[in-house]
């Protein structure tokens, strides 16, 4: 064979080998024009966007853009936390909250104290706390002559101001983790217009001991614009809420969730208030302390299965639940030690290394929820994580926990064709992103990660929607 054809064949062989590498599949592909146009309208440069698009079955990369660059993922960090939890604990795993009745019970009276020990359950909401106290009453207790003692020792974390992240301490997404987290340390105000009385009734849940909130606010005419601002509520003390403004009739019924302004005492006020509402009497007080270590609990309250918790974390991007899970993973690894943030970070990075290899600078773990300015992850690493999940025994559980575009959760307002993608969203002031699975017209399934880090990030949402729509149309296969 002449030398020139041999050299040509050798070159073709080299190209074939190189094209087996992920980069080769995307070297000639640019961003879709509709995505570029949407970025331009948002005044966001292409350099602010990272993308990794893979075929879910083969793992073949069909579009990559700065995929190895570590960027702030915002709530996409929850994918790492929830995937690790499903892998390490399993979808049916539950938290256990033990309860002790320390003392004899005679004629409806507990001659001693009631102890409740937290283990990180993120779903100890008012309804489940009611069930816990109802169980106490079913054991014959109507009056407690001692104290109700709350044990938070399973987590060893520093107290902090809920407003530290963004100055919005009254927003529930800023609530801090707690081994005994009750009702997300938040209250809910429901406003119900009563046209005949010319007021909106204010309903407060849950009942808190010592709480005094205005039970009504005057109705006003006009549109329902900034209805929260129109109330002119003083949020400095949520246990003594007063409204100096009005509520527009046009708003109909609305709900306003608020983080309690005194989280350190919230549990005590909630348990005392709920116990009293249930007809119980308490001669002592509700206080923090240590549960008995040498006796078996009188009973235990089981949480919903992990799958339900993961679904709520991912569908609705619940930060405090994600942080509870993050710390729980460390606690389960070393159950004889209180979980710390440092231990939780180490545990999560160890899991990523075991399952995906050493991430290096492509992963910076902070608090498990993504509510952070310091967290970092690459689009490549998130895509590999989603491929791992796709081929795992818990594939269906993780995928079903993600918002469905145009249907539910944080994706209900997506502009892409509804019902064809399961995608976790990530949003901060300067971050916008999605990560998950997209089903195309032909039935192909793609793994998609797209993140924008820029001051105008949220204006780039239409560009991300356009990228999702492009994948749905099988454009990557053309």
Segments the model singles out, each with a brief description of its role:
Residues 64-84:
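Short active-site loop at a secondary-structure junction
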Residues 10-22:
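Bacterial N-terminal signal peptides
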Residues 1-5:
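N-terminal secretory signal peptides that target proteins for export/translocation
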Residues 65-71, 257-258, 369-372:
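A short glycine/serine-rich beta->alpha loop
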Residues 62-64, 316, 326-478:
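Small-residue-rich helix-loop
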Residues 31-39, 88-360, 466, 473-477:
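Conserved serine DD-peptidase/penicillin-binding transpeptidase domain
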Residues 59, 78-85, 148, 180, ...:
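Residue-level preference for non-acidic, small/hydrophobic
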Residues 26-70, 95, 130, 135-138:
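Beta-lactamase-like hydrolase cores
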């Amino acid at each position: 064979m002449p030398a020139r054809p041999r050299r040509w064949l050798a070159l073709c062989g080299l190209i074939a080998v190189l094209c087996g590498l992920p980069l080769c599949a995307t070297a000639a592909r640019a961003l879709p024009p509709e995505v570029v146009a949407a970025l331009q309208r948002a005044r966001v440069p292409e350099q602010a966007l990272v993308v990794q698009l893979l075929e879910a079955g083969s793992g073949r990369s069909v579009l990559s853009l700065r995929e190895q660059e570590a960027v702030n993922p915002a709530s996409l960090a929850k994918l790492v936390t929830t995937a690790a939890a499903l892998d390490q604990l399993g979808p049916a795993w539950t938290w256990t909250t033990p309860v002790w009745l320390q003392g004899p019970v005679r004629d409806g009276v507990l001659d001693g104290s009631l102890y409740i020990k937290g283990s990180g359950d993120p779903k100890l909401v008012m309804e489940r706390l009611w069930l816990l106290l109802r169980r106490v009453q079913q054991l014959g207790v109507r009056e407690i002559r001692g104290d109700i003692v709350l044990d938070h020792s399973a987590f060893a974390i520093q107290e902090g101001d809920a407003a530290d992240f963004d100055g919005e301490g009254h927003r529930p997404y800023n609530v801090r983790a707690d081994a005994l987290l009750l009702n997300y340390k938040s209250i809910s105000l429901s406003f119900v217009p009563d046209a005949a009385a010319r007021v909106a009734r204010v309903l407060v849940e849950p009942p808190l001991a010592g709480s005094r909130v205005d039970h009504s606010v005057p109705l006003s005419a006009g549109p329902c614009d900034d209805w929260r601002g129109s109330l002119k509520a003083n949020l400095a003390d949520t246990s003594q809420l007063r409204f100096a403004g009005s509520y527009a009739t046009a708003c109909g019924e609305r709900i306003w969730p608020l983080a309690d302004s005194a989280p350190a005492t919230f549990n005590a006020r909630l348990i005392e208030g709920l116990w009293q509402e249930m007809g119980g009497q308490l001669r002592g007080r509700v206080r923090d302390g240590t549960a008995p270590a040498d006796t078996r609990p009188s009973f235990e309250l089981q949480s919903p299965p992990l799958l339900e918790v993961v679904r709520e974390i991912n569908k609705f991007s619940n930060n405090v639940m994600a942080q509870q899970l993050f710390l729980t993973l460390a606690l389960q690894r070393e159950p004889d030690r209180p979980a710390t943030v440092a231990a939780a970070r180490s545990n999560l990075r160890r899991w990523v290394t075991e399952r995906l290899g050493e991430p290096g600078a492509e992963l910076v773990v902070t608090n498990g929820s993504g509510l952070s300015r310091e967290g970092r992850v690459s689009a490549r690493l998130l895509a590999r994580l989603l491929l791992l999940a796709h081929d795992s025994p818990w594939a269906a559980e993780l995928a079903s926990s993600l918002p469905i575009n145009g249907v539910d959760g944080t994706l209900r307002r997506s502009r892409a064709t509804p019902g064809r993608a399961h995608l976790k969203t990530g949003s901060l002031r300067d971050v916008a992103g999605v990560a998950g699975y997209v089903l195309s017209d032909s039935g192909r399934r793609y793994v998609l990660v797209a993140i924008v880090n820029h001051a105008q990030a949220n204006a780039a949402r239409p560009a991300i929607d356009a990228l999702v729509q492009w994948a749905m149309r099988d454009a990557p296969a053309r």
